[in-house]
Amino acid sequence: TSTLLPHTSSAKKVSLTESFSLFAMMLWIFLDSALFESLSRDISISIWRDGYSLEIALFHIIGVVCALYFKIQKNQKELLIIILFALSYLFYFIQEALILSIVYPFVISFYNVVILQTLVKKDLKTLSIYMIFIGWIASGTGLFVALENLILFVPMLFLMALLKILNTQQIQHKEKTCLNSF
């Protein structure tokens, strides 16, 4: 844990100490980077140029507040983030700028808080390795997808991520059932 952050009660620490996998964090950064870079280059839809600044700012703040104060289980957070990214991509594909300017900033802020809560617990060496994968590889791959106009392949990633999350939940449910039977 960090010495720079205030200590919280043990009840709060339980929910904040959930670490998310490097795979999940890389996926979120990739999805964000690919959508952000695609949006930046798309002249047919722009949530920044089309006057949605208030919605964007408001839902960034709401995303931070929700990530900090709503206590939900790790798998539920992962599923929520994936669903919100899927909705963001859906609203991008169907050119629904208003709803995109609400959902996308919310998920950006929400997942960033979740990532920061995970990274703050890592030692410097581990953090350096994570930053290579998160900051360079995942974001660079997202940029590549946008530059090469491969954004339509992203829905396949949603399917793979959803299957991974559902499989993890099923395994945890089986383990819980097995432990409860003793």
Tell me what each language-model feature is.
Residues 1-27:
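Flexible interhelical linker loops that connect adjacent transmembrane helices
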Residues 1, 48-63, 100-108, 152-159:
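Alpha-helical transmembrane segments of polytopic membrane proteins
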Residues 19-24, 41-61, 80:
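Loop-to-transmembrane helix entry
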Residues 75-115:
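C-terminal transmembrane helical hairpin of 12-TM major facilitator-type secondary transporters
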Residues 24-47, 116:
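Helix-loop boundary and gating motifs at the non-cytosolic
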Residues 121-158:
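A late C-terminal transmembrane helix in Major Facilitator Superfamily
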Residues 61-78:
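Helix-to-loop junctions at the C-terminal end of transmembrane segments
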Residues 1-7, 149-174:
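Symmetry-related core transmembrane helices of the 12-TM Major Facilitator Superfamily/SLC fold
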